[in-house]
Amino acid sequence: MQTRTPFRATTAATPYDAIRPLPVTILLGNVRSLYNVGSFFRTADAAAIEKLILAGITGYPPQNMISKTALGAEETVPWEHTRQPAQRIAALRTAHYEIAAIETSVHAVDLFDWRPRFPVCILFGHETDGLTPEVAALADTHVRIPMLGLKHSLNVATAGGVVLYELLRKYRNLQA
């Protein structure tokens, strides 16, 4: 029988109704793994983002493999599915969102040097192919995660966590 450690928090540090959403929307373009989609839901809930947009072939709830890694976050994070990511990106741009692609393009700025203009929409692509050229071209900025190892590669859901928490840190510093 497994028991919780006595020092582990079982409730949120801040009441949910007191949390203002982080002005970030994430668009997942053609993310193949439903486990990665579920991980994005869970991290999106932890960072209290505005919305998750699931585009192209990206799977969407209800699906058991999403639920397995989301642990219920698919019920708490606002989300939508679209087959037309370009139209959603255009609507976000009209609403004054900065559109930032997480890519390793030659023009990408380092995540730690990037000064985002909130609100921001972050674009993540397929696990091995990245964003389609058409979607990548719609970004105002390309941002890369600095990597020191030889692979120069992170799992897309892991990359999402890295980027979201750097954005959370930057946003909180702006509010201080």
Which functions belong to the PLM regions below?
Residues 1-176:
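Post-transcriptional modification and biogenesis factors for structured RNAs
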